[in-house]
Structure formats: structure tokens, C-alpha cells
């Protein structure tokens, strides 16, 4: 892949990551959300083959709007298939900086031992893996994907009381669903899905993540 194409891909991927962080409630500047390809090149370079940028240059650290101590890293490992050594380096950095959540944007995937280490570190450290291919477009901007809103515990309690339901009576959505993964929705959370409706203006459904 030539430099121009690779730079374009890296820009698109990082832009989706910025939108994802923003949509999860983390503080991202408007400049970060709106960064053009030219601005990306000015900041990071346009010659990936010469290490400008190296993937590690694209690392992101964001703090949550509601709680500045709730921070999240986004790592871009250099190696196409990520091994356990890299995961240990990331985990050490997270420990040093007292950060418990990170996203890892991988080119081709992870080795079985690296994948297992993510499972072993949860729930103390939450590391989520995304394939860069998944991030070339923002799935939530697709016209067929309805708006998803993660509900607070209070909103869920109110919803169940209003309809006299138990939580396990709600329809389900898988935690591995692409939109659920984008928002970082965990098992046991409830998501409100808002679809446009020709008759009612909008049609709302609720799903329990499993």
C-alpha cells in the first residue's frame, strides 16, 4: 500500500476513534472531531513508510466528561498481529498512570495468548480490541443504523416500574453487536433504540445487553 493510501486509512481510523470517544462521553475537542486529512498530515506526517507517522504516534488519551479521573487510552500497535508482550507493555503503562480502560486498534488481530490475557485482566482492566477495518467507517453514521442511547440505572428502574416489567423480560441485544461494541455497552446494561417512524414520528424499543 502506498503512503498516500495508508495515510488516508490512518486518518479515517483515528477520526472514527475520536467520534467513538466523544459518543462514549469522553472529552474530545471539536478540532479533533473535525480534523481534515491535510491537518492530520501536518500534525503526524504523510509518509508512514518512513515512520511519519508511526502508529504509536497516534495514541489517544481521553478523560470522561462526568468524571475527569475516568480516563481511557487508545493504542495503535505497530505489529500486524498483536502478541502478549505488547499487551503487557500497555498494561504496565495503564498501571503507572492509574487508567483501567483502553481500546486497542489492531491491523490483523491478536494471538490466542494475547486474547486470553484481555479476559484474564478483566474486570480490573478493560481492554477492548477493534480491527482497523471496522473503523474505516463510523457504523453509527450509516443511515440504516438507528440511534442507540445507553440508559442510566435510574432510567432503567423507572422504565421497568412504568411498564411493570422485570429486567429479564426485555428483548435482548448481544454484547458483540457492532453498535454495542462501538459504545462499549456491557452485559446487563439497557440500551434505548430510537428509529424514525412515518406514523409515530419515532419508534422506541429497549434492549438488554447480554
From Swiss-Prot:
Cellular component aspect of the GO annotation: nucleus; RNA polymerase I complex; RNA polymerase II, core complex; RNA polymerase III complex
InterPro entries, alphabetized: Arch_Rpo5/euc_Rpb5 (IPR014381), RNA_pol_Rpb5_N (IPR005571), RNA_pol_Rpb5_N_sf (IPR036710), RNA_pol_subH/Rpb5_C (IPR000783), RNA_pol_subH/Rpb5_CS (IPR020608), RPB5-like_sf (IPR035913)
UniProt keyword annotations, A-Z: Acetylation, DNA-directed RNA polymerase, Isopeptide bond, Nucleus, Transcription, Ubl conjugation
Subcellular location(s) per record: Nucleus; Nucleus, Nucleolus
Glycyl lysine isopeptide (Lys-Gly) (interchain with G-Cter in SUMO2) crosslink location in chain: 81
Gene Ontology molecular function: DNA binding; DNA-directed RNA polymerase activity
SUPFAM superfamilies registered for this protein in UniProt: Eukaryotic RPB5 N-terminal domain (SSF53036), RPB5-like RNA polymerase subunit (SSF55287)
N-acetylmethionine found at: 1
Nucleus keyword on record: yes
Pfam families listed in its UniProt record: RNA_pol_Rpb5_C, RNA_pol_Rpb5_N
Predominant cellular place of this UniProt entry's protein: nucleus
Top-level taxon of origin: Eukaryota
One biological process term in Gene Ontology: transcription by RNA polymerase II
Function summary: DNA-dependent RNA polymerase catalyzes the transcription of DNA into RNA using the four ribonucleoside triphosphates as substrates. Common component of RNA polymerases I, II and III which synthesize ribosomal RNA precursors, mRNA precursors and many functional non-coding RNAs, and small RNAs, such as 5S rRNA and tRNAs, respectively. Pol II is the central component of the basal RNA polymerase II transcription machinery. Pols are composed of mobile elements that move relative to each other.
Subunit record text: Component of the RNA polymerase I (Pol I), RNA polymerase II (Pol II) and RNA polymerase III (Pol III) complexes consisting of at least 13, 12 and 17 subunits, respectively. Pol I complex consists of a ten-subunit catalytic core composed of POLR1A/RPA1, POLR1B/RPA2, POLR1C/RPAC1, POLR1D/RPAC2, POLR1H/RPA12, POLR2E/RPABC1, POLR2F/RPABC2, POLR2H/RPABC3, POLR2K/RPABC4 and POLR2L/RPABC5; a mobile stalk subunit POLR1F/RPA43 protruding from the core and additional subunits homologous to general transcription factors POLR1E/RPA49 and POLR1G/RPA34.
HAMAP family to which the protein is assigned, alphabetical: RNApol_Rpo5_RPB5 (MF_00025)
UniProt xrefs under PANTHER family: DNA-DIRECTED RNA POLYMERASES I, II, AND III SUBUNIT RPABC1
Family that this chain belongs to: Belongs to the archaeal Rpo5/eukaryotic RPB5 RNA polymerase subunit family.
Name of this protein: DNA-directed RNA polymerases I, II, and III subunit RPABC1
Organism, scientific name: Bos taurus (Bovine)
Amino acid at each position: 500500500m502506498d503512503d498516500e493510501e495508508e495515510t488516508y486509512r490512518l486518518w479515517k481510523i483515528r477520526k472514527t476513534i475520536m467520534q467513538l470517544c466523544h459518543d462514549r462521553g469522553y472529552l474530545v475537542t471539536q478540532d479533533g472531531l473535525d480534523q481534515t486529512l491535510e491537518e492530520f498530515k501536518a500534525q503526524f506526517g504523510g509518509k508512514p513508510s518512513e515512520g511519519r507517522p508511526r502508529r504509536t504516534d497516534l495514541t489517544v488519551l481521553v478523560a470522561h466528561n462526568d468524571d475527569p479521573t475516568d480516563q481511557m487510552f487508545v493504542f495503535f500497535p505497530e505489529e500486524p498481529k498483536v502478541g502478549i508482550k505488547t499487551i503487557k507493555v500497555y498494561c504496565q503503562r495503564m498501571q503507572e498512570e492509574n487508567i483501567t480502560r483502553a481500546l486497542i486498534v489492531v491491523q490483523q488481530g491478536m494471538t490466542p495468548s494475547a486474547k486470553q490475557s484481555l479476559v484474564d485482566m478483566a474486570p480490573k482492566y478493560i481492554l477492548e480490541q477493534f480491527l482497523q477495518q471496522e473503523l474505516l467507517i463510523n457504523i453509527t453514521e450509516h443511515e440504516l443504523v438507528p440511534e442507540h442511547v445507553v440508559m442510566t440505572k435510574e432510567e432503567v428502574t423507572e422504565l421497568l416500574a412504568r411498564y411493570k416489567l422485570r429486567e429479564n423480560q426485555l428483548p435482548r441485544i448481544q454484547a458483540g453487536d457492532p453498535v454495542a461494541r462501538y459504545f462499549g455497552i456491557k452485559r446487563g446494561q439497557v440500551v434505548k433504540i430510537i428509529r424514525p417512524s412515518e406514523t409515530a414520528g419515532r419508534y422506541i424499543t429497549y434492549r438488554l445487553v447480554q
